[in-house]
From Swiss-Prot:
Classification via NCBIfam families: PRK02302.1
Pfam families assigned: DUF2129
Protein name from the UniProt record: UPF0298 protein SPD_0651
One of the record's GO cellular component terms: cytoplasm
Upper classification of the organism: Bacteria, Bacillati, Bacillota, Bacilli, Lactobacillales
Organism: Streptococcus pneumoniae serotype 2 (strain D39 / NCTC 7466)
Protein localization: Cytoplasm
Classification via InterPro entries: DUF2129
Superkingdom field: Bacteria
UniProt entry keywords in alphabetical sequence: Cytoplasm
Length: 82
C-alpha cells in the first residue's frame, strides 16, 4: 500500500536553464522558472542536509535555499471574502 513520504522543498538557482535536466535524478522538479532561472525540487526530508551540501558544490548551481512552506500554519480562520 502507499505510504506517505515527508518531503521538503529546495529552491535552486541556476546559471543556465539547460542544467535543469541534471537535477531530475535528485528529486521531483515541480516548478521551473526559465525567466528567473530557478527551480523548485522536492526531496525526502531525511536527505535535505546532505543534498544541500552536495548541490552547493556543483559548478552549474548558483545558490541553494531550503523552502520553509512546512513551517507555515495552514488552518485558516475567518472569512476570506471582504
Amino acid at each position: 500500500m502507499f505510504e506517505k513520504v515527508n518531503r521538503s522543498g529546495l529552491i535552486i538557482y541556476l546559471y543556465y536553464n539547460r542544467d535543469a535536466k541534471k537535477l531530475q535524478d535528485y528529486g521531483d522538479i515541480t516548478y521551473h522558472s526559465k525567466k528567473h532561472r530557478y527551480l523548485q525540487l522536492y526531496v525526502p526530508t531525511q536527505e535535505v542536509e546532505q543534498l544541500v551540501g552536495r548541490l552547493s558544490k556543483e559548478k552549474f548551481i548558483k545558490k541553494v535555499r531550503v523552502c520553509h512552506i512546512q513551517e507555515l500554519e495552514t488552518p485558516f480562520v475567518g472569512n476570506l471574502y471582504r
